[in-house]
């Protein structure tokens, strides 16, 4: 009985993690353009617009740039346009 309840708890926990992570994995952070761009790595002094664009072009996207998020924009992420 104890083994069955432990298995059920593990399965339930994994199902919750999968459901939550599937929403996060999509990578779309911009609500207005969620279907037209994919955002991932935070932009830094080393990862700027040029580097972001290069990464996106290498992944066969049309273009890429650092996009600010928040009001006011407090963080920037590298976003590839589809």
Swiss-Prot record:
Q: Which keywords does this Swiss-Prot/TrEMBL entry list?
A: Antimicrobial, Disulfide bond, Fungicide, Plant defense, Secreted, Signal
Q: Which cysteines are joined by disulfide bonds?
A: 39-80, 43-66, 52-78, 56-79
Q: Name one GO biological process term.
A: defense response to fungus
Q: Does the keyword Disulfide bond apply?
A: yes
Q: Where is the signal peptide?
A: 1-27
Q: Does the keyword Secreted apply?
A: yes
Q: Which GO terms describe its cellular component?
A: extracellular region
Its family remark reads: Belongs to the DEFL family.
Q: What is this protein called?
A: Putative defensin-like protein 70
Organism equals Arabidopsis thaliana
């Amino acid at each position: 009985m104890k083994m069955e309840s432990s298995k059920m708890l593990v399965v339930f926990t994994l199902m919750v993690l999968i459901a939550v992570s599937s929403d996060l994995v999509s990578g779309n952070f911009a609500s207005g353009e969620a279907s037209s761009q994919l955002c991932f790595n935070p932009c830094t002094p080393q990862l700027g617009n040029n580097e972001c664009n290069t990464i996106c072009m290498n992944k066969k996207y049309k273009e890429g740039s650092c996009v600010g998020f928040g009001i006011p924009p407090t963080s920037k992420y590298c976003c590839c346009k589809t």
